Amino acid sequence: MAIWQVDFYFVFNNTSDIPYAVLAEDSFIKLLSVFPIGKSWNNDLIVYGELDSTCICVWKDSNNVEISCRLDVSSIKLQEINAIINFADTNGLMIFCNEQTIFPTLDNIRKIIVDSSAYRFVKNPESFLNEINNNQL
């Protein structure tokens, strides 16, 4: 994951192992309109978007999937956030980030972004790197 990205997982009934059967197939089709299929380094991983930008990663096994999301704080678009929220809402998914399960809303995603080290880096790279150098993180 890049320094300008923040990530989180989607959970269903408080677990990251999501039964594939509960996911609406058309929700993935809708994702494609915003996030085309990107390059993957594993046959069991489907990447919607690009790994070094905003993307949704879907790990598949025989019955379950694990879904994570990376937000490119340096270039995030409202259309992308809305697509992520719609995907979660359509499938009854919650966001798991920083040891908390939260509803997938614009305000909650904004808070995830603003509270992230990625945001601090994008806002002021030199100050952020000085914090790292001075062990202030």
Regions found by a protein language model. Name each.
Residues 1-137:
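Acidic (Asp/Glu-rich) sequence patches and key acidic residues
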